[in-house]
């Protein structure tokens, strides 16, 4: 598996880098949570902008982005608008989604931008190109909240993201059996061994899949999401537990 270095953070080497989500409705609550998370042992903060009540107001969006960048210090900022189709809070038209991504890119405040794979396949090259032009790395994401696809399908999806130009392909799936979790881990290992052009981020969701959030260094998932008090997805493990287990399972 290759690595990518962003603001001194090497993603894809050593223990998985930890992402903490911010899910809050108001500007004050978002920035208050950012200040709290900035002191915790993690590498990146994900702002889930679909929770923000004024996310489509460009002026409000720029103001929050600026406040987040100031609050987070050296931590990376990943900005995500998770649409309802991918398990998020709000639906957007393609133009609204493109406008949101454009505002994030030109703000100069975010190191990483989440771009959803399935809802935006036609627009994907343009969205990724726009981000790269602004110096923003792209996490290209796909979610299945009902099942775990076959290993072949998961690898095909992740490699398609690589081919579209994503810096960090991301896949989250729901297991219905322990063997589903093994399929996700096997697909992750296959990506690391046979398609190492980029790091990848993978997870099996829910309590059944929680183990996948803790063994990324072994199987090849470069980042993991931890719960700092309020989870943004099913199965996120408490931050202190994640840090302890990642240290215990370190291969270094």
Give the residues covered by each predicted segment:
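Active-site beta->alpha loop and helix N-cap motifs at the rims of alpha/beta catalytic domains
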Residues: 3, 15-133, 143-147
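Eukaryotic low-complexity, non-globular regulatory regions
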Residues: 8-15
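Catalytic alpha/beta core domains of metabolic enzymes, predominantly
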Residues: 102, 112, 117-252
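Short beta-strand/loop segment at the start of cytosolic alpha/beta domains
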Residues: 1-7
């Amino acid at each position: 598996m290759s690595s990518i270095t962003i603001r001194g953070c090497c993603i894809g080497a050593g223990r998985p880098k930890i992402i903490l989500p911010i899910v809050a409705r108001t500007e004050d609550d978002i920035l208050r949570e950012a200040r709290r998370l900035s002191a915790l042992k993690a590498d990146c903060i994900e702002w889930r902008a679909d929770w923000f009540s004024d996310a489509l107001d460009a002026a409000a969006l720029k103001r929050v982005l600026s406040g987040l960048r100031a609050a987070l210090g050296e931590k990376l900022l990943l900005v995500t608008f998770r649409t309802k189709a991918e398990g998020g809070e709000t639906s957007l038209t393609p133009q609204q989604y493109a406008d949101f991504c454009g505002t994030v890119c030109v703000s100069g405040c975010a190191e990483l931008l989440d771009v959803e794979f399935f809802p935006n396949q036609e627009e994907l090259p343009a969205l990724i190109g726009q981000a790269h032009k602004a110096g923003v790395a792209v996490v290209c994401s796909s979610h299945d909240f009902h099942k775990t696809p076959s290993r072949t399908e998961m690898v095909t999806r992740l490699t398609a993201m690589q081919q579209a130009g994503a810096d960090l392909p991301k896949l989250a799936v729901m297991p219905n059996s322990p063997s589903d979790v093994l399929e996700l881990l096997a697909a992750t290992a296959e990506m690391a061994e046979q398609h190492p052009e980029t790091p990848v981020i993978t997870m099996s969701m829910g309590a059944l899949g929680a183990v996948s959030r803790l063994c990324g260094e072994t199987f090849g998932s470069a980042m993991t999401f931890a719960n700092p008090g309020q989870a943004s997805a099913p199965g996120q493990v408490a931050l202190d537990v994640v840090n302890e287990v990642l240290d215990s399972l370190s291969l270094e």
